[in-house]
A protein has these predicted regions:
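Non-heme Fe(II) oxygenase catalytic core, chiefly the N-lobe of the double-stranded beta-helix
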Residues: 1-184
Length: 184
């Protein structure tokens, strides 16, 4: 029972669980999330677990169990989580903290050698001349554990999209491994 979330299947796949955080929970997270700036989160690992605990406390400890259950279930294995309503309270820093809290409810993230942080962050633009396919719009971005920029074993990958504006062709698409044509 999650009174503070709206939970349903994604409109295009029952393998993807949509979790929308209601305003009352967002309001309860503002204070604990403001205690730490992004730089503090980057340099002090315990602060990441502190904001994760704040998020989990809003659900009496049920959110972490639910997220881990989804990830370990082959029939789902995927969720999309975020505020139901976006406002000035849910700015980029808030969303980075929310993504940090979610990842730390699931486990201890690997250190990304390329970014030099516990997370990698980049902008995707309509036109991009970089050599990284990660920054190119309208290309498939396959989440996989081989070729990640870490030295540790990687159990799963999480991707958090902070903002999407003026996209040509619609929203980002997400497919479960079992839905790929080449895997059938």
């Amino acid at each position: 029972n999650f009174d503070c979330f709206e939970i349903n299947f994604h409109e295009k796949s029952e393998r993807i669980i949509n979790i929308q955080i209601l305003d009352e929970i967002i309001d309860r997270l503002i204070f604990p999330f403001k205690k730490f700036d992004i730089t503090t989160l980057e340099y002090k690992p315990f602060t990441r677990f502190t904001i994760a605990q704040s998020l989990d406390d809003t659900t009496s400890g049920k959110l972490s169990s639910f997220l881990n259950l989804i990830l370990r279930d082959r029939d789902t294995g995927c969720f999309i989580i975020g505020p139901k309503n976006y406002s000035s309270k849910t700015d980029n820093n808030f969303l980075i903290k929310l993504a940090t809290a979610v990842t730390h409810l699931i486990g201890n993230p690997n250190h990304d050698a390329m970014a030099g942080k516990y997370y990698a962050r980049f902008h995707v633009k309509h036109e991009d001349n970089s050599d990284s396919y990660l920054r190119k719009a309208y290309t498939n971005m396959d989440l996989h554990t081989d070729g990640t920029y870490v030295r540790e074993t990687t159990d799963w990958l999480l991707m958090s999209k902070i903002e999407e504006k003026n996209v040509e062709g619609g929203e980002t698409a997400m497919l479960h491994l079992d839905d790929w044509e080449e895997c059938k």
